[in-house]
């Protein structure tokens, strides 16, 4: 299984590799947000991927009907390979993200490569959104969830998490609040979007007042 959930552009080296893997018999799945169909992708993009053997779905496609569901967007960047390796972070599939094409000057982004038990959670997040977005055989999903990544010895831990319209708890906000409220030395945050509610502002303020080094890096171009 090669599963990819992220922003995507029309053509490029990565898509050529995905086509090659699909032709070799691998189960390749691509899911992207419906806003891409309004900005960067052609109207028949899903059909074109299907023709080369890539399973593809759109999260919350844009339709000519007014709906509050259009506020639900998929901004995750997740790639899972064979249930053993996963990538996540801020990188979409586009040339400007590796500075092969200049749109906004030099692009600085961050992504992580994970192996070990954390891969299982990212795979579950991807497959959950895949089943919600389209129709899929649940036994097929169970097959992939039963795959176990190789164990890795580590002195720390990695805990992937996700928010979606399916969750009623503010998982991401609670994670940040916990980190801020329990910090003793420093908290460094790098984010493209800084939209703080009063609770997060108070947590940052209290952390700074008790001597914690709180730093935030944001992009120069919003």
Task: Kindly give the residue locations of the regions a language model identified.
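Charged, low-complexity intrinsically disordered terminal segments
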Residues: 4-5, 9-222
């Amino acid at each position: 299984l090669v599963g990819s959930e992220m922003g995507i552009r029309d053509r490029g080296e990565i898509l050529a590799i995905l086509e090659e893997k699909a032709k070799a018999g691998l189960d390749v799945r691509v899911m992207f947000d419906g806003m891409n169909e309004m900005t960067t992708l052609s109207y028949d993009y899903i059909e074109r991927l299907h023709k080369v053997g890539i399973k593809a779905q759109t999260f919350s496609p844009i339709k000519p009907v007014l709906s509050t569901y259009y506020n639900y967007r998929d901004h995750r960047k997740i790639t899972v390979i064979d249930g053993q390796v996963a990538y996540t972070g801020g990188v979409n599939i586009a040339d400007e993200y590796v500075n092969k094409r200049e749109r906004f000057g030099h692009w600085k982004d961050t992504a992580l490569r994970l192996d070990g038990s954390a891969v299982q959670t990212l795979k579950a997040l991807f497959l959950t959104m895949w089943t919600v977005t389209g129709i899929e055989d649940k036994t097929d999903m169970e097959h992939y969830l039963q795959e176990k990544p190789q164990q890795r010895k580590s002195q720390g831990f990695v805990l992937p998490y996700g928010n979606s319209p399916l969750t009623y708890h503010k998982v991401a906000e609670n994670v940040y609040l916990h980190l801020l409220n329990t910090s003793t030395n420093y908290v460094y945050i790098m984010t493209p979007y800084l939209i703080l509610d009063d609770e997060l502002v108070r947590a940052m303020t209290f952390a700074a007042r008790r001597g914690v080094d709180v730093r935030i890096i944001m992009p120069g171009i919003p």
